[in-house]
UniProtKB/Swiss-Prot annotation:
Coiled coil: none annotated. This is Major DNA-binding protein. It is found in: Host nucleus. Keywords: DNA replication, DNA-binding, Host nucleus. GO terms for molecular function: single-stranded DNA binding. GO terms for biological process: DNA replication.
Amino acid sequence: PGHPPGIDTPNPQWFWTLLQRNQMPARLLSKEDIETITAIKRFSDEYSAINFINLTPNNIGELAQFYFANLVLKYCDHSQYFINGLTAIVVGSRRPRDPAAVLAWIDRTINGAADVEPAAQEVLQRLGSNPAAWTGTFTSTNMVRYVMDQRPMVVIGLSISKYNGSAGNNRVFQAGNWNGLNGGKNVCPLMAFDRTRRFVLACPRVGFTCEAGGFGTGVRENTLSEQVRGIVSEGGPMVQTAVFAAVLHALGARTQHLAVDDWIGLVDDEFLAASLDALNATVVDQFGEWSVEAAQELVKNMEAQTTAGAVAAGEGAFDFGACVGDTPQQSTSAFNGGLAMAAAPAGQKRSLPDDILFDMGAPPEKKSGLTFDML
């Protein structure tokens, strides 16, 4: 059931979106599928109820790390405020594959337009001896300990700012991206978009990484990466179709040269990147050769198949909202359309009979500020 129309590879985004919208036909789910869905939903609800980490885990390792930290916080009576999280920005490099990306490194005479592509191909073949032509990459991960073990140099990015203290003196300094307890207008506003997130830079070599942008201008460049991240955050049954269409509109024929690493850099998700990379191969398989028109036609066909693949009138759909029971029998009742155990209100922990040590009631509303004891 995890295969979207027209695609041979499973797509978790499509699968879970249909489940959450109650559009997944019940006939496609086996008893084992129902039990797995029930266990995942129950764990997700319980994790959300005790979560005080304002970051979304990207893999099983990060989920285990965050879950263990939340259990420690719960045992220590932590409440109200999200804790600070540390994210590693890993700097790397890769070989460019698009001939247009290496035009600046062509070192032979060009007599006409027909000489450009062969000259660019020569540069691509000699990339091993020309590291300056490689493309810089940036990926983020919350598994900071793994990064510290694997990378030869890790830099903590800090900004130092002087501001007036509560006693009126001007000799108080702060480091990092603290934002103050009550707004702190005199505190350095760098990286104030997220008060609970800290960053480290992991660099494989010493050199210039990125330029600091101007602050306070009120102008934000609408880049392709931001458009793609917005599409991914909005969700939907066919996110890869919308992302592929946006990239195709922006890059045109260069889309066919994008590799998996390029897609990962855009969407920051390996599964979605693999699905997007497969779309280029699908264009060639269905139309014989890659072209912008063929890619647009494929996107149009996939969107039409997705719309037609919704649950038809009168067909039983799996009730995801009722899938919160603690036993397989309750899962089966949800599959059959019966009413399973009702979920607790949002943000409130459901009491379980075997949860005695950590049965501490519902946490209060979580705030993104900082407390005195945290400082």
